[in-house]
Design a protein with these regions (language model features):
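Conserved donor-nucleotide/metal-binding helix-loop-beta segment in metal-dependent transferases, i.e.
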Residues: 100-117
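Short, conserved active-site loop motifs that form the nucleotide-linked donor/cofactor pocket
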Residues: 2, 59-61, 114-115
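Active-site-proximal specificity loops/subdomain of glycosyltransferases
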Residues: 36-86
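N-proximal low-complexity "stem/linker" segments adjacent to membrane-targeting elements
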Residues: 1-25, 34
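Short, acidic, metal-binding catalytic loop of nucleotide-sugar glycosyltransferases
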Residues: 19-31, 39-40, 55
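Eukaryote-skewed repeat-based solenoidal scaffolds used as protein-protein interaction platforms
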Residues: 79-82, 95, 101
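A short acidic, amphipathic alpha-helical/loop segment
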Residues: 18-22, 77, 103-105
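Short beta-strand-to-loop acidic/aromatic patch adjacent to the donor-nucleotide binding site
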Residues: 85-96
Length: 117
């Protein structure tokens, strides 16, 4: 399985759609993209309500509401959903990815699955 895990903060929720679309447009498709969004942030007074979260008409994208673990939220928010021995790619919500990014990670992962990149 290939998972992409991402989180966002209130100041960047409006740009999340572009980043996720670039992940959906990959030459090597992920099996699942988890978007981890805390119910409440420890570092910010703002929150993200359900109606602020972009809707993705795609079964690959799953919104995970979770506790805020700071920068670790992008991994820890969905950690219990990963199958063992899977490729997990941590992505940023403010970046548009080249369409070959997942393909390249998968290539190197398949050569050395015990390494981190």
């Amino acid at each position: 399985m290939i998972y992409v895990s991402i989180s966002t903060i209130p100041a960047r929720i409006k740009n999340l759609n572009q980043s996720v679309q670039s992940l959906l447009n990959q030459t090597q498709k992920p099996d699942k993209i988890f978007i981890n969004i805390p119910f409440k942030y420890k570092r910010f007074s703002e929150t993200i309500s359900d109606d602020q979260i972009p809707k993705f008409d795609n079964s690959i994208v799953e919104i995970t509401r979770c506790e805020d673990c700071g920068p670790g939220t992008k991994l820890l928010g969905s950690l219990n959903k990963f199958e063992k021995n899977s490729l997990v790619i941590l992505a940023d919500d403010d970046h548009i990815y080249e369409d070959y990014m997942i393909e390249k990670f998968f290539y190197f992962y398949s050569k050395s699955p015990n390494n981190a990149y």
